[in-house]
Amino acid sequence: MNSVPKPQTKRRTKPPVPPQKSPALTGASLDLLIYLALVLATFAVYAQVGNFEFVNYDDVDCTIGNPHVQQGITAQGLEWALTSRDTGNWIPLTWISHMLDCQFFGQDSGWHHLHNVLLHALAAVMLCIFLERATGTRWRSALVAFLFALHPLHVQSVAWVAERKDVLNACFWFLTLWLYVRYAERPGTGRYLAVALGFCLGAMAKPMMVTLPLVLLLLDYWPLACLGQRGRKAIWEKLPLLGLACAGAAIAYLAQKHAASVNLVPFDARLANATHSYTLYILQTFWPARLAVFYPYPRDFAFALLPLLAEGVLLAVVTTGVIVLRRRAPYLLMGWGWFVITLLPVIGLVQVGDQAHADRYMYIPMVGLLVMLIWGAAEILEKLRAKRLAIPLAAAACLASAVLSWVQVGYWRNSETLFRRALAVTNGNKVANNNLGSYLMDSGRLPEALPYFETAVRIDPESAISRENLGTALGKMGRLPDAIAQLQIAVRLSPDTLKPHSDLGTALAYAGRLPEAAAEFESASRIDPNDAIVQNNLGLALSGIPGRLPEALRHLEEADRLSPDPEREQVIAHLRAKQQ
């Protein structure tokens, strides 16, 4: 029997399953990746500092050479940090951070350097967090933060241990701005007090916080756009912060005067230098070439008139332009205001120190220029319908900055590489000649050191430090008459400074002129009675003068009280026996 075939039914096929896509990164995850990339990029450029030495330009005075800091965290050290005006600044938090380094890392200069790098990376992350919260734009904020982290003009603030105050202050600066954005979103007493606390902590790291209340007003204009809505309240609420800022400025000025850092530069020269420096900082932001640790003032404070007028006109044109465009592009007014205002304390109208300008002064102010650049470039690319160029242009800018910074960081390896570079890219640099000479002298390379000290004296014959260094080098080379002549000039130029008197006393003692040597040590002792070395040398000089042995013993015993020394105790015992 033939089987009847079953009727065929159409097979139902399942619809094709679309390929599974990996879930997109959430906003928070993407932000974390950006922050991680910022930290990694920063350490990629700066990790080399882990093998660097302290440089002989304030590093040792701020760390292992400072008796209050080198002991780490102690009750006496904390009291000193809160009251000290050393280095011409009131910066207790910065001192405490150096104490922590000495507590955990001792004299290992590499770890002191890496602490700076960590704080710089943290500041870049805080900048990114603040800008994204304030503007609502992730990638523009991230690019500003990357350029901040990688820009060569910031190398001085990071690779120089003594500039710990820059990177520490920046962390509190950006934290305070983020806290202020939160306060502006939902005002309240608690949030306002958080802003005030951040401000105070930043001021305890570096006095640059003095301009922050004015920057908050700029943020009210853009990007927060709340200045018109809140009216006078936006101004009144800044007054307590302005009061704190004025108090901080007064403390900083008095500290600088106490440290004799406020120099008498003619006002017309200061005004000319301020105009030139504003223009130069803009140029160095976009073309960071020939950077140095120290830039001297022009000889006799002479500025060329026509270039100076051109720079003044340029600044006036930019200022006018950002005001005219304030409604169409409000970020320009905010960025320019940020740049101009935050530079005011260090632009040189009140001259502090010998420098004409400094890379480190752009650490915070550069953010204003970067905001103008990034937001402006983004708008231009949108109008040109060329947004696809944004990523390659941003990558090129970051890569170029990273490469240039890597090279610039290398100059900070030690004092010799740092100051040889400064001499290569500047003229008439007394500081670079003195510091390079000092490094060579301390390394036992006296014949190499001498020409640098002689050059420093030629640049500024009225510099007590240059005369003192030259005299010390000549003395170590056995040229005592020449050494004494230079040190006598140093004493005349700086009669209230301890070291010239002490060095002259040492040279006179080696020359056998003990009464004159004792007189110089006595002058040094009057300046600082608690200097053990001066007391020791005064005692030794007096011990060689007939009839003055009791005085000699008194000073040697005082030296031993200040700094106990077994060898000195043997000398004291010998002199006591001789006295009997």
How would you name each of these model-derived features?
Residues 544, 550-580:
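Terminal, low-structured helical/coil segments at or just beyond the last alpha-helical repeat
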Residues 442-443, 476, 510-511, 544-545, ...:
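Register position in tetratricopeptide repeats
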